[in-house]
Amino acid sequence: MTNEKMIFRNRVVDKGQLRNLISWAFTHYGTARTAVMADKLKDLGFRYATRAGVSISVDDLMVPPSKRSLLEAAEEEIRATEVRYQRGEITEVERFQKVIDTWNGTSEALKDEVVTHFKQTNPLNSVYMMAFSGARGNISQVRQLVGMRGLMADPQGEIIDLPIKTNFREGLTVTEYIISSYGARKGLVDTALRTADSGYLTRRLVDVSQDVIIREIDCGTTRGIPVRPMTEGSKTLIKLSTRLLGRVVGEDVIHPKTKEVIAPRNTPISDDLAKEIEKAGVAEVVVRSPLTCEAARSVCQHCYGWSLAHAKMVDLGEAVGIIAAQSIGEPGTQLTMRTFHTGGVFTGEVAQQVRSKMDGTIKLPRKLRTRTHRTRHGEDALFVESNGIMILEPRKEGSETPAPQEIHVTQGSTIYIVDGQQVKKGQLLAEVALGGRTTRTNTEKAVKDVASDLAGEVKFAEVVPEQKTDRQGNTTTTAARGGLIWILSGEVYNLPPGAELVVKNGDRVETNGVLAETKLTTIHGGVVRLPEATPGKSTREIEIITASVVLDQATVTVQSSQGRNNYLITTGNNQVFNLRATPGTKVQNGQVVAELIDDRYRTTTGGFLKFAGVEVQKKGKAKLGYEVVQGGTLLWIPEETHEVNKDISLLLVEDGQYVEAGTEVVKDIFCQNSGVVEVTQKNDILREVVVKPGELLMVDDPEAVIGRDNTLLQPGEELLGQVATELRYIQYVESPEGPALLSRPVVEFAVPSNPDVPSTTSVSQQTGRSIQMRAVQRLPYKDSERVKSVEGVELLRTQLVLEIEQEGEQEHNASPLAADIELIPDLEDADVQRLQLVILESLVLRRDIAADATQGSTQTSLEVKDGDTIVPGSVVARTQILSKEGGIVRGVQKGSEAVRRCLVLRHSDMATLNISAKPKVKAGDLIVAGTELAPGIFAEESGQIVGVKNAGESTTTQDAALSTQNYAVTIRAGRPYRVSPGAVLQIEDGDLVQRGDNLVLLVFERAKTGDIIQGLPRIEELLEARKPKEACILAKRGGEVKVVYGDGDEAIAIKVIESNGVVTDYPLGPGQNLAMPDGSVVPAGQPLSDGPSNPHEILEVFFSLGSEDGVYACASHALQKVQTFLVNEVQMVYQSQGIDIADKHIEVIVRQMTNKVRIDDGGDTTMLPGELVELRQVEQVNEAMAITGGARAQYTPVLLGITKASLNTDSFISAASFQETTRVLTEAAIEGKSDWLRGLKENVIIGRLIPAGTGYNTYDEPGMLEDYSTLETTSVLDETDDPLDMVLDDRTARAYNLDSPGLAETGFNNRRSILDDDELIADEIHDLVEAEVEVDDEVDDDYEDDDEDDDDYED
């Protein structure tokens, strides 16, 4: 070690410095020693952290004292804006934007204030030290602790214009706390969604690039890609030196001034060289890149450059594809997912503010093209249409005049001063829109509704409404011209439906005067019944009985069983009915009220029903039964049916056998009647057993009796020698004893045509509906229906049905009529209850609401008493609407259908000023606050002048000259609202509005934040090569732009005129804005409108341009354009989030997306149209064709997204393990594909050693490599006696030939053994082994050669 003095550098080593230090150590001294150094640094850090004991206490959070004044200034500005809004100078949207921008500005200013405050007062403050050394926390967190939290977005992404003014040190108010938790929740949800997305992206990336391995040293290509610094507007995002670091020069780099070669071709660019190139001012450098590498299915060392992990040339066999995929996928989590549609708020960053550097005068040159323009804060400004300059002439300072300053303004900038205006130092002159991409920030249409702040009548001033009808026939009214909408104050009353006004325009009403009244009338008339007003609730309902029916002879008794009440009705002739509808409920027309209880029609078993003379109504639901129309007889043939589902083995009787009652027919089932058994079975499963009672008559000749099957035998008829005494039913059966006839008994039930109805008395209004009870008989079964049952069934039911006659009622009541069932005590005998059915018309009285301000107070009076009989159409009650305050009635529209609102102009709505001077205003003028009414007198509030009276008229003429005149000016309060052109009007001139009614929908454009789809979704869109939603229009050929304007000043189309005079038209869709001004010259592929470009279209445009050098050159050129586009766009997204990724990683991925072409025509090759083949492969085949004279294959380059590319890879094993396994494998099997196992994934799946790293060359010929030590940079190991030197680095060890000399030969160094061969193997067999090894090698060689040939053939 030399005796030089140590140099002490007085610097703070922050995170960045530390990073550089460690990377330097790593590059020069290798991993092991760096690890030791890092350890020592760690110990140092911990030791001093322990000594210092830096921690945060609440006292460390120092709030800058200037915070108060900053907030006050902001509030002041907002108050001023509010006043402008009140005066109708700006719209609601402009006010909102201004408020938000003000708060954002304040928040930023406060942040800077926090920093300076810490620096000046206490640089050793622990909070400050932590945040600014990069140890913990960052400035935005500190801002929340000691500055202000700022604005938050609500769940819809709209910004809430109430900022959080406090910080966590001072504590949040409840409102602020809740607003603040909105944003926090959003962050959490976002993160949760992000991790999954990012993981999937990484998986797809790995899959597409896993087989990219460095396999050659130099592919020998002369192509390269130009590298420039990456800029956005005037801001450099990535410096040239950063982009060059670790690349290999593709063409000699020449110094622009001295013309000497700084770096010859194939030089790796180190850090120093990169800085030197940048210093020399070289604009762009052509470097070799994975995009242009010509190695087959891999990338060569020279095209890849340094492995960024060690800052050395990349090793052969390095799996650069996987590294690239991980480098792009890993930061994915840090990208924000959802864009906060924050109402165009964060676009404050977009514009750079130009402030005056000194006092002076501004001159705008004549040739500067500007137009007046209203800014988003509602201020007037000039909009610059083409690039130019403005001149600032400084004020004269003494004798010498400083030179005037030129200020450059770009197209799209906004100038805030006018020609010749005096400006002060620091005054805002202009906002320059950043050049380049941001001029095409997308805008989107958004709407905001404006609600009225006061009730009153609407008056349009300067607003020109315009009606549009869309295809659906909906009309919308929009403002063709902007202007003011005035709301002139007054009390607006909402009239209830059906109210009639009793006043007219201009009438004067006193307090509690009647404005309108509603009448409650009855439609049908009848007997009034007022339900008893229970103490708690007043009488709201009036019932009018229009019709009723009473069962006057029947008594009602109640039986309770199991907690349910059964009502039984006993009629005069002792029929008992069961009430089916409980009292107090409503009964519809045709509903059953009661059912007769009788057992006359009950059977004992199931059986078979036949009608004799009985007729039923055909229609009707089977559920309710069939109504009997004509009486007659029901014939019932009993039979007993057992439905069983059991195995046939459980049957104990035979089909056709005669059994006695009580026989067990099936296991556990006994029959109840004697008779013949009929068994139904299906698939050895017993379905049902039927026992048919009757007598069995054996037959000798079946033919003779077959006609008697299923017939009735009348009494007195003879059958087989027997005379029947009663009606029998004959059936033919096959019994076990032989053929027989079964004679079955028949039961008859008589059905009367008209059942008797209990006597009723009914009351009915002459106009109303009549109501009566009708008895109906219903049969539940059809003719010839079999009733399967063991127990008995009821064959006929007699029911009482309610019938309401509806005559001409349809228009009043669409609802079906209903009657109420009530029990009323009998008039003579109070103990007996009678059943009464009534039809009520029930009228509800309006409650008198004092609370609803818009309705005025109401007063309701009842016009009838209980028990009155009234005629239809009489008034039952009337409600009057009273005015709350006296005033004049206005705003009753004449001739309009029903008037729903009316306005009372109160005294409090008007103010009178007494003025001595002559007023400058006249009646009817609309004035805003601050207008001069008379010399020296200004209006305090906005409104309309109602009258100007001359009060001081003197009586005598000679005094007239002396007396001063007095004027009384009366102003009616009002409120103006500014409406921007194109807003949707929701009211008309002269309408009456309540407070809070919507007046207009303001339509405004807001900038979509950034490139709207930032972050992961945008990266995914690029890498999956999706077509963007609103893509821009690309110029297909170069030329001069001519803009075609439509009937507005809207651009509707763009014409591009080429140099040879060809004109191409590009129509602009809705929502597309010009990106190129009129007259500019554009190259092919240049976006003409705003929006993201469609990469497929870029490829198509450049490919269709064609080229003299044939289709291959053309395809390569087009692919290179789209590759550059993709690399830059992906970089943009990551840069916008402050994430640095080396270009080469993105290039490796993009290379995999762009190396295929689609065959259009196979020519004489073996390729089929539509097949996806690698570009280089087609080109080789085409070259072969050119030699043999065959027709070449025609193709189009394609861009595949990463998923598509993964599925189209050569290796089907890799593709199948990714997605759509069955499809990939079946296709591979049909095509008979072979997998050459070139990538990592295939080998992992099969279980071989992967061909990367140490496994590289395991399956390749060993002789390819030159000796490693020639590639090795010289080591910087110092010859010191430091114990650290015992540590050898894994990468520098090769330079020190530590292995036995025999093994340092070429070809073996990639398989270094740890121990010497001699130590492993005993001496005798050593020679033998040596010989064998050589043989192995040869075998290997041959095999590998084969493989190589295959390779070539495949290429």
Swiss-Prot record:
GO annotation, biological process: DNA-templated transcription
Reactions accelerated catalytically: RNA(n) + a ribonucleoside 5'-triphosphate = RNA(n+1) + diphosphate
Region Disordered, residue ranges: 1331-1355
Cofactors that this protein relies on: Zn(2+)
Pfam family membership, one: RNA_pol_Rpb1_4
NCBIfam families, sorted: PRK02597.1 (NF002724), rpoC2_cyan (TIGR02388)
Similarity section: Belongs to the RNA polymerase beta' chain family. RpoC2 subfamily.
This protein's name: DNA-directed RNA polymerase subunit beta'
Organism: Nostoc sp. (strain PCC 7120 / SAG 25.82 / UTEX 2576)
Gene that encodes the chain: rpoC2
